[in-house]
Amino acid sequence: MKPHLLQNEELKELIAKIPGWEIISNHLEREFNFGDFIEAFSFMTKIALICEKYNHHPNWENVYSKVIIKLSTHDLGGITNLDQKIASEINEIFEK
């Protein structure tokens, strides 16, 4: 998938398609909370496999049972269709 920057209208529609995510500055961000560190780390491991598949990696933080994920395409300077796809897949993993 070749990434392209999402424009204002696309960004507005994006939030409805990926519940829980926010647009902050030039990236997508979402916080996920789990019961403990093992659950949080397991979630991160599943996400890592998706990110490797697309060769597109998030900025993220993990503090015990909390994971904060930030997605943007640095080369293009903002949020792209690839960030949207990965955010959607992350939501699917979280909902399982």
From Swiss-Prot:
Keywords: Lyase. Gene3D superfamilies: Transcriptional coactivator/pterin dehydratase. Its EC number is 4.2.1.96. One of its GO terms (molecular function) is 4-alpha-hydroxytetrahydrobiopterin dehydratase activity. The lineage of its organism: Bacteria, Bacillati, Cyanobacteriota, Cyanophyceae, Synechococcales. It comes from Prochlorococcus marinus (strain MIT 9515). GO terms for biological process: tetrahydrobiopterin biosynthetic process. CDD domains: PCD_DCoH_subfamily_b. This is Putative pterin-4-alpha-carbinolamine dehydratase. It catalyses: (4aS,6R)-4a-hydroxy-L-erythro-5,6,7,8-tetrahydrobiopterin = (6R)-L-erythro-6,7-dihydrobiopterin + H2O.
